[in-house]
Amino acid sequence: MKEEKSFVKEITPQSEDFSRWYIDVIRKADLMDYTPVRGCIVFKPDGYELWERIQAGLDKRFKETGHRNAYFPMLIPESFFQKEKEHVEGFNPELPWVTEAGGEKLEERLALRPTSETIIGHMYAQWIQSYRDLPVLINQWANVFRWEKRTLPFLRTSEFLWQEGHTAHATEEEAREETMRMLEVYRDFVETEMAIPLYVGQKTPSEKFAGAVDTYSIEAMMKDGKALQAGTSHYLGQNFAKGFEIKFLDRDNQLKYVHTTSWGVSTRLIGALIMVHGDDRGLALPPRLAPIQVIMIPVGPPKFRDKVMARFDPLFDALKAAGVRVKADLREETPGWKFNEWEMRGVPLRIEIGPRDVDNKQCLMVRRDTGEKIPVPLDEAVERVQALLEEIQRNMFVKAKEFRDAHSHLHINTLAELKAHIARCEETGEIAGFVLAGWCGDAACEAKVKEETKFTSRNIPFHPPARKQVCLCCGKEAQHTVWFARAY
């Protein structure tokens, strides 16, 4: 993560340098700032407000599905990580450790949590005794630490914010139902609120969460064609239950291990929002998630200000009363400067009122997604705003899906064809995107594809647009149809 401190005058076009465009946008929109600690960023108010909107939407859904919030310690004893072999091997390189406290060396190192299965497993073992204690349905909103070598704001940082759900169940069936239920909660939220289309499916064994039996993911395509894993849901089986002795007496008075799940999304979703919808003018936020849905700007010479505000203020109040997140920009800047500023910040809808509009008893509405300018009678303005916000939300999803589908390739069947596709895209500047291909199930084939192309398996989709018959790598019969892509 190059820590660029200078003010961004102009946003680099996406077609010129997508990575530079991304940094320019988040800096110019004032979403974050860098700190002296590598990979640790400040979420400035405009950036944190996006996370608050995501939190609010997901938290509501979690509570509707019976989950409650709790908070567990950030410091985790080293010995806890030894209780689940795969888990410690998966996270060990990324763990930051606390070795001293109070001026003395600690008897046991404490990890800054990379995820909380271990500490939560330890506590569940104290709390769960009987089938009457089940299920346990808990979510935690927290910060976590993974010492990343290559960092990028919001997408890959050493410290990030997330939620992690942890549940315990009496049976495998119940736990698997929970795993899929929460995957669907994520899919619904990201597609309906964030307007981001997803490929939903199961991770291959080499890509699953360390310590899980099965991992499922939602995968999104960014505007540079790369994949972003937007959320995961894990069926952990009894792996952590056995490691932490989480047992219960069932109805027949038999002592059994629980079945557990975990599931999470993080501030990566902010990065996804920017990279899926943003353009060369800056951010473009879907109305349901935008902190400000409508920006109102008075225009015209100062001598007409009272005349304009006599119509401006009542409309502002009416929109606020209707539940629209509306803001008025009354600063001493030119209207043109304000238009560009709020377009760059991604506000879905702009309303302009000038002296001529007052004479005509109308206002001018301008859509961020299409740039369309729509004159609207003032007495219809509130209803039109509500309708336009829904239309913008739908249109942003449709545009993102059309882009994704246009760059999802279904006719590449061999490793040679994949290499040729990548080479052609690099030569022409086209987007390589996602490739749907067959896979025999051999981890060596999956690893070879990654090594030779940097394309990784994203997931085995539940509903693939086609079924592949032969393995992309070895040509043997395919056991799975898999999405491959380069990824963040």
UniProtKB/Swiss-Prot annotation:
Q: Which GO terms describe its biological process?
A: prolyl-tRNA aminoacylation
What top-level class of enzyme does the UniProt entry assign?
Answer: ligase
Gene Ontology cellular-component terms listed:
aminoacyl-tRNA synthetase multienzyme complex; cytoplasm
Q: What is its EC number?
A: 6.1.1.15
What does this protein do, in the record's words?
Catalyzes the attachment of proline to tRNA(Pro) in a two-step reaction: proline is first activated by ATP to form Pro-AMP and then transferred to the acceptor end of tRNA(Pro).
What UniProt notes about the protein's domains is: Consists of three domains: the N-terminal catalytic domain, the anticodon-binding domain and the C-terminal extension.
GO MF term list: ATP binding; catalytic activity, acting on a protein; proline-tRNA ligase activity; transferase activity
Task: Report the subcellular localization.
Answer: Cytoplasm
Sequence similarity: Belongs to the class-II aminoacyl-tRNA synthetase family. ProS type 3 subfamily.
HAMAP family per record:
Pro_tRNA_synth_type3 (MF_01571)
Q: How does it assemble?
A: Homodimer.
Q: What is this protein called?
A: Proline--tRNA ligase
